[in-house]
Amino acid sequence: MGMDQQPNPPDVDAFLDSTLVGDDPALAAALAASDAAELPRIAVSAQQGKFLCLLAGAIQARRVLEIGTLGGFSTIWLARGAGPQGRVVTLEYQPKHAEVARVNLQRAGVADRVEVVVGPALDTLPTLAGGPFDLVFIDADKENNVAYIQWAIRLARRGAVIVVDNVIRGGGILAESDDADAVAARRTLQMMGEHPGLDATAIQTVGRKGWDGFALALVR
């Protein structure tokens, strides 16, 4: 970067990635494989993934539920945070995405602690075993977030943590918007704030993925 060039969020992300994450062949290969399979580029960033990993480790999560696998990038981070004795159940609607994720998880050396469940999450959630869960990460179709959170509360232990991605939508949650995802994000935050079984907050984020954020809630 030249002396006269102002830093921007993607530049800062690049610095943080090189400084705090470093080279990680398994993660790089997971992203490359997802691109090769033409999966949408909507995975969490490396910093967000590292946050999930550290959060899982900090609360000693041994049973993790993920709703929305995509290519398994965030799943790898969650599995690392849960550790060798942990178990991650990840739900994915698209069979193609699940296939890519399974290969990525195997390459990353965490496939033995991850179960990939294929199908609409609202159909598979009632069938899940392996709970109660210590940590739930929701990053799927936004219009069903409220239903996913309701299921997360049922399946989680008291004191568990629920994380919901993409809840700021570039500030779209404040606008009179035709964006269904922004409307869903606002409804999600309102539900989390009003639910007697949750104590919630939200953090805005900025980086190469733009202006967004995540909600975090403790199950009471």
UniProtKB/Swiss-Prot annotation:
It catalyses: a catechol + S-adenosyl-L-methionine = a guaiacol + S-adenosyl-L-homocysteine + H(+). GO terms for molecular function: catechol O-methyltransferase activity; metal ion binding; S-adenosylmethionine-dependent methyltransferase activity. Its EC number is 2.1.1.6. InterPro entries: Cation-dep_OMT (IPR050362), SAM-dependent_MTases_sf (IPR029063), SAM_O-MeTrfase (IPR002935). Inhibited by EDTA. Its cofactor is a divalent metal cation. A divalent metal cation binds at D139, D165, N166. Keywords: Metal-binding, Methyltransferase, S-adenosyl-L-methionine, Transferase. GO terms for biological process: methylation. GO terms for cellular component: plasma membrane. Homodimer. This is Catechol O-methyltransferase. It comes from Mycobacterium tuberculosis (strain ATCC 25618 / H37Rv).
